[in-house]
């Protein structure tokens, strides 16, 4: 069982604040049972699951409302209509290309709405890999650059920070 394995591996790790029942798996009884197992094993940490909005019959799966890419105005509206839980964006922007606009709307919402817990950016670090070309010069690679069948192409070439951690790559990086 993945929830028990996750718990046993990480139960004493001080950085674990919230247990997660997964990502983008929709809702349902199995995910709900995972949340119950986390609560049974650990009565002190919260449980998170993003897919509750797709199946409200298991609304108690997550201790907070969690959605992806909901506009700041939509979050504010949801909280006004549903005061019973705080709200967290498990993804609210995707740091790829010329993205991460309107981040200020989310930080402003944090100042206005105490039940808005903030959110997470996908991706923080560029996932490209360094490789030497035939002349010995290093370059960044991604899907298909190793003679393999390309997967998602340059989809991994993203992130707020460069793969070398030497600089921020997006104009909105200072807002993070």
Segments the model singles out, each with a brief description of its role:
Residues 1-168, 173-174:
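Extended substrate-binding grooves/exosites of carbohydrate-active enzymes
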């Amino acid at each position: 069982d993945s929830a028990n394995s996750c718990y046993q591996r990480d139960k004493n790790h001080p950085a674990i604040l919230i247990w997660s029942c997964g990502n983008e798996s929709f809702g349902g009884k199995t995910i709900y049972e995972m949340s119950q197992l986390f609560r049974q094993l650990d009565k002190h940490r919260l449980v998170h699951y993003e897919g509750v909005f797709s199946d409200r019959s298991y609304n108690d799966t997550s201790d907070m409302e969690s959605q992806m890419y909901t506009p700041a105005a939509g979050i504010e509206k949801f909280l006004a209509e549903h005061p019973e839980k705080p709200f967290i964006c498990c993804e609210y922007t995707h740091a790829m290309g010329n993205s991460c606009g309107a981040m200020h709307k989310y930080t402003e919402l944090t100042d206005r709405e105490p039940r808005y817990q903030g959110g997470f950016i996908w991706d923080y670090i560029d996932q490209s890999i360094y490789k030497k070309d035939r002349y010995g010069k290093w370059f960044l690679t991604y899907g298909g650059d190793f003679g393999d069948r390309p997967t998602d192409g340059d989809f991994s070439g993203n992130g707020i920070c460069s793969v070398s951690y030497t600089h921020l790559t997006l104009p909105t990086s200072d807002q993070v």
